[in-house]
């Protein structure tokens, strides 16, 4: 877990929690970066051509890539970048802790790394159902899609 400058960031238990709720096919490493809203806005503009901040960005790894220090075949699922300011505001709005919001966002981002896309026309609520099942497994009362009313 790093900040936007690559320095270690503190989000105690987040990686372990995500690993405990992840679907079986989520094999490999997920790099999670906690970044400022301004940094996430820059990334959102650069990679999605949207000049606004967002809560979490997902960057899937190329197939076959391996994370540093991992055995061949273990692989890298990809990177998640979470906007800390947005996460804090959303936590307050949802009446739960910042740590809980980080879990909500990390789970949502992981599903995007696995190829789910709730904005796709052919999704038909599939990502929302998977997110709901996994968040219940992890003890979360609501997921990002459910909160957004999608």
Indicate where each model-derived feature is located.
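An acidic/histidine-cluster motif and surrounding catalytic segment
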Residues: 1-103, 113-150
